[in-house]
Amino acid sequence: MSCSRNRDALTSRPVSIELISKYRTELMGIAMLLVVLFHGYVPQTSWFYGLKRMGNVGVDVFLFLSGIGLWFSWRSCPNLKHFYKQRFLRVYPTWLLLASCFYGFHFYHKSGFSNDVFDLLGDVTAHLDFWLHGELTFWYIPALMALYLISPFYIQLVNRNRLYTWLTIVPIVWCCAVAWIAPLHHALWHLEIFWSRISIFLIGINMSPYILQKKELPPNTRPLLWVMFLFPLVVACYLEQWEHGHYPLFINRMLYIPITISGVLIASEALQHTNKVVKQCWAFLGSISLELYLLHLHFILVPLQRHHLNYFVTLVLCLAISIPLAMLVQCIVSFTLKHINR
């Protein structure tokens, strides 16, 4: 009887958009786990392949939540110099440390990542090989920093006139152009992974005023949220399982947009009714997500996969090794920055 009352109370409540901000760090933790699941190796012949590939949506969740965070950051201090400094200090020192370790090691061993000293400097400082050739080792960080650069101008634009939120359509049209117009495809297709993620980042910025205003969706929105989560998820999963390699991957990123928005709203509501300890675990993962992202794949997971262990065993080992290292890197960077700022 009490379970029935709780269920009725939940379904009769409006859907609170504000919960996205309240549980932003926890959602970052969930997104990080999805990315780790995505990076684990499963052969394309496996029944689990398509589902595993859905972990890629974790990147879109990161960008969506980053857009929200940047809007609130700009609102608290609308100063370009302060904004860029805060964003730079949040990402760049960690990136510089780990990129130097990775590319320096491979340059020393002539592993093929950097051809000469200038190439090495370009990779370490700005991951130039991503922008020039589509080298994806740590693509997310330079892509994120590029979005940081444009975000204050977009925020001011949409704050001035909400009609500019329609600009989120432009990257989608641009992806179609780059996919099928030959000169653009030849010159810019290597950046598809970036172009196709711009829209979800801008949508995060667009939604932020509604979070601030504590907007709510009516209770009967819930079935629609589940439809908008499950329908594109099933389609994307099918495409990855049965059609992977036969269509431009940006199609999947377009499907990730409704999956991300509806999924984040559903997950936010679930977190509201989740055990405190579980929430703390997700928040902890979210608090070291930058370090985990940079460490888990090329430093830990790739070497582990050479041992051909079970998929889930490999991922558990990867997390068991990556989490303490991520905490250590975070401590080193924080300690260094504190001493520099003295």
Segments and roles (model prediction):
Residues S12-S16, W189-L202, P209-E291, H298-C318:
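Alpha-helical transmembrane segments and terminal signal-anchor/GPI-anchor hydrophobic tails
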Residues Y23, N56-D60, H133-M145, H190-I205, ...:
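Membrane-interface micro-motifs in multi-pass membrane enzymes
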Residues M145, H296-L297:
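Transmembrane helices and adjacent periplasmic/lumenal helix-loop junctions
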Residues M1-C176, P219-V227, K276-V278, A283-E291, ...:
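Membrane-cytosol interface segments of multi-pass membrane proteins
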Residues S66-S76, N206, G263-E269:
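Canonical alpha-helical transmembrane segments
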Residues L163-Y210:
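Loop-centered beta-sheet repeat module
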Residues L37-T45, V173-A187, P232-G245, H298-I300:
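C-terminal ends of transmembrane alpha-helices
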